[in-house]
Amino acid sequence: MLYYIIYIVCSSFIFASEFSFDTLWGQCTLVNKSSLSSNNIKETIEQEIQNMYESYGSIPLNNFSILIDNNHVQSSKHPHWKWSLGITYKNPDKIILKDPAISKISLKKFKKVIAHELNHIMLNRTQHYHTIPRWFKEGFAMKIADEISMYHKLKIASNTNKPSLFHLTNYSRFQGMNKEEFHFAYALSSASILLLDKIYGNRTSDRIAIYLIDGLTFQRSFYNATGFQIENFYQRFYNEIKKNFFWFKFINLPKNLFAIMPLILIIGFYMKSYRNKQIIEKWELEEELEKIDDTNIN
């Protein structure tokens, strides 16, 4: 904690580093207001773009900028900034990343955030980007950035008894959400991508992205990749969620058992005491009966 306090104080004296460089997607202007190495960030950007270029092909060239911000000014401009690690804008293409010293994430995690937001740039440059539902955009970006974790799976599992939360069409846009709803929407988005690849075959989400880049709408891309209309996925979604995520609840079972262990011990103590009392009463009754028998014999 002391490190972050010192950093925040000192960061006000750090001058922004700004320079431009060419990429496979066009010229990138990097504005770095953090203490991170600009050259290392540049290399990460170039590598992630190269990876997506090799996997999904070329996209229209256009200039874009990436700002690493070390203050909270953006929170007044974007309602989700205080919960986000990065935000991507279109027209013009711009990524704003929260300084990892403020968000308190590791450099490894920060590089994943870069990959996530660059993925948004890629899909935003498709001809029919406006047809892509938000759940697919976020889930696919999380997959590419390797951000899908056990946390997201447990969050889904803990809500499988609430069917109203799993109407996937409600997540075409993320609007009017509080913090809890916002994080659940991301968990649901990650689950949707996992289920797409499980139900319709490995790399289904990748094939959808390729069709999008080729100029098709999301609905047509989904059909070409799966052989089904998108409604098929919407109808199956909740049942597939229950079937594939319910068992994750049991991962928390040891922790839950530990929490109620004192109650279990108390109940066990009283059950044991009651049983012992019954045994003692039985022995006493047998002794009384033996005494009666002895008296009758005499």
PLM features per residue range, with description:
Residues S17-Y129:
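Juxtacatalytic substrate-recognition/specificity segment
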Residues Y4, I66-N70, E138-G139:
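Short, charged, low-hydrophobicity "junction" segments
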Residues Y3-F13:
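Sec-dependent N-terminal signal peptides
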Residues S12-S20, K249:
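Bacterial Sec-dependent signal peptides at the C-terminal "C-region" and cleavage site
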Residues C28-L30, F64-I68, D99-I105, I132, ...:
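Low-complexity, flexible helical/coil segments
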Residues F245-N298:
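C-terminal single-pass membrane-anchor helix
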Residues I87-K94, K108-K112, Q127-I199, D206-I251:
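Acidic/His/Gly-enriched intrinsically disordered linker/tail segments
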Residues K111-T126, F182-A191, L257-R275:
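A short, terminal or domain-edge coil/loop segment
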